[in-house]
C-alpha cells in the first residue's frame, strides 16, 4: 500500500550547495538532506559550489551551506535573477564568507576581502570576523515571526558572526556581543553591540533568508592549517534543540515559502522542543 502524500503542493526543485573550507560539510549536508526528506514534494540536486548556473536557475529554492566559496559575477547575478523571479535562497552559516587564510610564516591573521560583491549584495551581508567559539545567548528580535514563534531565547556554543550589513534586513534573531574577534584583521564594527544571526531581505518577487548559526567541524577539516587531525569533532551547535527547531523551519520555508501550511511533514514540526 502506498503512503499518502504529505505535501499538497506539486513538485519543488531544490538545489543544495554544500562545500568549502574548514567545516564538516558531510555532516551538514546529511542534516539538511534529512530535513528536506521530510517533504515528499522535494526533488533535490547536490552541488559543491555555484558553478552549475543552469541547475540553480531552474530551482524553486537554493539552500547553501558553504565557507569561502566565492560565486563569480555571472553565477551571483543568475542566482539573483532567479530569486527576483520568485525563488527562495536560504544561506546558512558561513555562506556569506570569503576568507584569506594566513600565509605560512606570516602573522596568523585571517582577512575577509570584499571578493564577491554581487553575491554579498544578494545576501545583504558580508562576513568580517567572529569571536572565539564559546557559549553565547541568542535572543528573539521578532518573537512573533513564523521562523521563531514559540521558541525562547537560548544559549548555544557557536560562532557569532560580525558582518557588514545592508540597510534592508529584517532581523529576526540576534546575539549581544561587544568584544574583540582575535585572529581576524577586522575585530569589531564600531558602535555595534548586537549581531544578527537570523534575518531576511526581499529581492524582487523572492526572498533571501540567512541563518548564520550552525558551525560544525570534523577531525580533518583544518589540515591545510597545519593540524592534520584535531582528534575530535565539533557539532555542539547542532545539539541545541532551539537551533534545530529554527533550522527545520528555515528549510520548510525554503521548500514552501510562506505557505508552509500546505505541507504536513511530520509530528516533529509541532514538537520541536520536546
Annotate the PLM regions:
Residues 2-11, 38, 189-195, 203-274:
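Extracellular ligand-binding/catalytic regions of CAZymes and related secreted enzymes
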Residues 4, 37, 43, 57-58, ...:
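Catalytic beta-strand/loop cores that center a nucleophilic Ser/Cys/Thr
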Residues 8, 13-101:
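Helical hinge/lid and interdomain linker segments adjacent to catalytic or ligand-binding clefts
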Residues 17-20, 64, 162, 199-203, ...:
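Extended, composition-driven regions rather than compact fold-specific motifs
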Residues 27-29, 94, 101-105, 184-185, ...:
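Short aromatic-enriched loop/helix-cap "lid" or pocket-rim segments at secondary-structure transitions
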Residues 28, 75, 115, 243-247:
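Stable alpha-helical elements in mature extracytoplasmic
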Residues 70-150:
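A glycine-rich, often tryptophan-bearing local segment used as a flexible ligand/cofactor-contacting loop or short
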Amino acid at each position: 500500500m502506498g503512503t499518502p502524500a504529505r505535501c499538497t503542493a506539486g513538485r519543488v526543485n531544490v538545489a543544495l550547495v554544500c562545500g568549502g573550507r574548514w567545516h564538516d560539510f558531510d555532516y551538514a549536508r546529511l542534516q539538511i538532506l534529512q530535513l528536506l526528506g521530510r517533504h515528499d514534494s522535494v526533488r533535490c540536486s547536490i552541488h559543491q559550489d555555484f558553478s552549475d548556473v543552469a541547475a540553480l536557475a531552474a530551482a524553486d529554492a537554493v539552500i547553501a551551506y558553504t565557507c569561502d566559496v566565492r560565486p563569480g559575477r555571472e553565477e551571483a547575478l543568475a542566482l539573483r535573477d532567479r530569486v527576483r523571479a520568485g525563488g527562495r535562497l536560504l544561506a546558512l552559516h558561513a555562506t556569506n564568507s570569503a576568507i584569506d587564510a594566513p600565509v605560512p610564516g606570516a602573522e596568523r591573521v585571517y582577512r575577509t576581502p570584499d571578493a564577491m560583491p554581487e553575491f554579498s549584495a544578494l545576501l545583504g551581508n558580508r562576513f568580517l570576523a567572529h569571536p572565539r567559539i564559546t557559549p553565547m545567548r541568542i535572543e528573539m528580535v521578532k518573537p512573533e515571526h513564523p521562523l521563531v514563534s514559540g521558541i525562547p531565547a537560548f544559549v548555544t556554543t557557536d560562532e557569532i558572526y560580525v558582518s557588514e550589513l545592508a540597510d534592508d534586513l529584517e532581523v529576526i534573531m540576534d546575539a549581544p556581543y561587544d568584544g574583540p574577534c582575535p585572529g581576524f584583521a577586522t575585530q569589531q564594527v564600531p558602535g555595534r553591540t548586537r549581531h544578527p544571526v537570523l534575518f531576511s531581505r526581499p529581492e524582487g518577487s523572492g526572498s533571501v533568508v540567512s541563518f548564520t548559526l550552525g558551525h560544525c567541524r570534523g577531525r580533518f577539516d583544518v589540515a591545510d592549517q597545519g593540524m592534520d587531525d584535531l582528534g575530535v569533532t565539533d557539532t555542539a551547535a547542532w545539539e541545541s534543540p532551539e537551533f534545530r527547531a529554527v533550522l527545520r523551519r528555515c528549510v520548510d520555508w525554503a521548500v514552501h515559502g510562506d505557505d508552509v501550511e500546505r505541507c504536513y511533514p511530520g509530528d516533529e514540526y509541532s514538537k520541536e522542543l520536546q
